[in-house]
Amino acid sequence: VVGCGPTQTGTTGATHQVTDGTGVAVTVPSEPKRIVPIAASTEDIVLSLVDPSRVAAVGTVVNNVPEASAKVEKHVKATAESMLSVQPDLVLVPNWMSPDAIGEMRNMQIPVYVYKTPTTVEEAKAVIHEIAGLLHASDETMIASMDADLKTVEDIANKHSGERPLVAFYTQFGLTGGKGSTFDDMTKYLKVHNAAAQLGLGPFDNGTREDLIKANPDIIIIPSVAYTSDGTTPATAEQLYSDPALQGVKAIANRRVFLVDSSQVMSYSQFMTRAMVSMAQNIYSK
C-alpha cells in the first residue's frame, strides 16, 4: 500500500495510518494542528469542528463560516507550492479535485486525505462524521442541527395537502439539479417533484430555457449568486419575470420565483439543510 512516506512536512508527534475515501493509505497526525481544508464545504465542516487555531490556511471561495475564517490568516491555492508555504500536517480535499494536483502534493510529502464528495444529505452526514473522526472532534452538535432542520422541513411539507408542486432549480447556466444531484435528494425531503429530473437531466446537465418552458414548473428556485469566477451574472427573478418567452410558465405567471442562499444550497456541508428549510418556507408559503 502506498502511503505518504514516513517523513512529512510539518508533522510532529504521533502519527497513524488511515485509508482515505479513494482507498489510499495516508499517514496523518493523531492530533492534526496545521489543517488545510480545500473547498468551501470542507472549510464549513472543519471550522465548525475545530478551533481556527488548528487551521493553517483556507482558500478564497466564500464559505458559510466567515467569522471563523477571519481568524485564519493565510490563504492558499490548491497547489503543492502554495501548500508548502504553510507547512500543513493534514490537507483535506474532495475527490472532484484534480488528481494531478493531489499527486503533486503527495510527491512533496504533504499528507493529503481525499474524501468522496457526497451527493445526498445522508452522505453529507457521513462525510462530516468521517472528518470529525480524523480531527478527533465531536460532530454531535452539527448532526443534531441538521436533523432539527430536516424535522422542520418535514413538518412544513406535511402541513401541505393536495398536489405536490413541480419545482425547477435554475441558475445562470440553465435548468439544473437533475437526477442524482444533491438538489434531487433535497426534493425528496421537500416532498416536491423535480422538474430537471422529470425531463431526464442528470446531475451535471444544464437544461435550456426551452426545457424550462417545457417543464412548466409551479415554482422556480434560483441561487442568490452562483460560484462563478468567469464573470457570468447570476440569474435573477426580475430577469425571469420580464422574459417574454416565459410568460406562459406557471411559476412566472404566479410570481413564484424564490431566491435561496447559493453558498448553502450548493454546499454539501451541514449548511445544506439550512437551505432546505428556507426552500420549504418559500415553496409552501401561501
Regions found by a protein language model. Name each.
Residues 60-64, 176-204:
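Alpha-helical, coiled-coil/dimerization segments enriched in small aliphatic residues
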Residues 79-93, 110, 208-225:
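Proline-aspartate-enriched helix->loop->beta-strand connector
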Residues 123-135, 139, 224-286:
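Structured C-terminal subdomain patch of bacterial secreted/periplasmic proteins
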Residues 100, 116-130, 162-186, 230-231:
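Extracytoplasmic ligand-binding site segments that recognize negatively charged/polar headgroups
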Residues 19-23, 71-81, 200-209:
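Short helix-initiation/N-cap motifs at beta->coil->alpha
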Residues 39, 95-96, 117, 219, ...:
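Short secondary-structure boundary segments
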Residues 34-86, 90-95, 195:
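A short, structured surface patch at a secondary-structure boundary
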Residues 2-41, 138-168, 282-286:
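Bacterial Sec-exported substrate-binding components of ABC uptake systems
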